[in-house]
Amino acid sequence: MSILLDSGASIDDILEAIGNQQNKKYKECFLKSTRNIKKGYSIENSFRSSELFSEFFLSMIRCGENSGKLSTVLKDMSEYYERDYRVKSKLKSIMIYPAILFIMMIVAVIFIMYAVIPNFALVFDSNNIKPPFFSYIVITSMLFMREYMNILVPIFILIPVLIYILIKSNTENMDKIDKLKCKLPLWNKYYMMSVTASFSRNMYIMLKSGIPIINSVEIASDIIRNNYIKKQLEISLRYINKGSSISKSIDLASVFPDVLISMLKNGEESGNIEKSFQYINTFFENELDIMTDRIIRLIEPAITIIMGLVIGGLIIAIVMPMFDAITAI
């Protein structure tokens, strides 16, 4: 849209052209927006009627219309969503190799359970071989799971689903989980780094586009998918409304790292809070990339070690009694 606007095309022609290239859902949305624009609606209200776009996106469009910089705003939004897509794609690619290893481990365990364990159990029984305690536990557990697999599998699937439903259906439980995400050792550093990078990026884009600071904080807060952080930012909004500085107000929320507060103070002193959010975003996104790469390097060998321990443990549990029997003979 930004490129086509710069080339001089009208907004309704652009939306119609884009709509004809999208799937049915998006095509209907863009064509409906085109009809509304032709009726005299603003671009924001035309998009809002489709109920497909976020409040963040709609606020940015409104700001672009009012300032006459719609093309610039759309370019910023394009970069924002491209970055968001790259991060999500990277996280998905991270999980492919561990997922493959995990599936291989499950397949190997199932093979041992159905093809190996029953035969060894039969040999032990027919020769009156009493396996060691560890082997006995493994073999008995495997035989039990094999016997009641049709009951155990639905239970193992149902329990997480029920827990998820119970948590989702209760706002208080969701708030506790969201707070735990921010406080849990090891995990909280990565999670808050991600939230801070996202929050600062959203704030920079909105302030750059001319959205007032109070509205920017409100919209940036709504985008965050964490009820605990949203409630803490309500404290910040109250203090901003009272006239407190942005750095002091966000500091009172007690959720963001000290680095963010310090950089905001510097931005207030220099009179360029917008640039401060840009620097904060750059800093935390770089830190996030470094930490993500470290996690990738740790996950792959960790999964391999776990797989080796599980498969190796099963093999030892099966083979050990056989060696004991041969030694006894």
Question: Where in this protein do the model-derived segments appear?
Answer:
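Catalytic metal-binding core of the metallo-beta-lactamase
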Residues: 1-100, 178, 182-301
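Juxtamembrane helix-loop transition segments at the membrane interface in multi-pass membrane proteins
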Residues: 126-129, 162-184
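Bilayer-spanning, highly hydrophobic alpha-helical transmembrane segments
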Residues: 86-166, 286-329
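Alpha-helical membrane-embedding segments
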Residues: 151-172, 208-223
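Exposed alpha-helical structural elements
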Residues: 56, 133, 140, 172-176, ...
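Short flexible/disordered coil segments
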Residues: 169-172, 222, 254-255, 285, ...
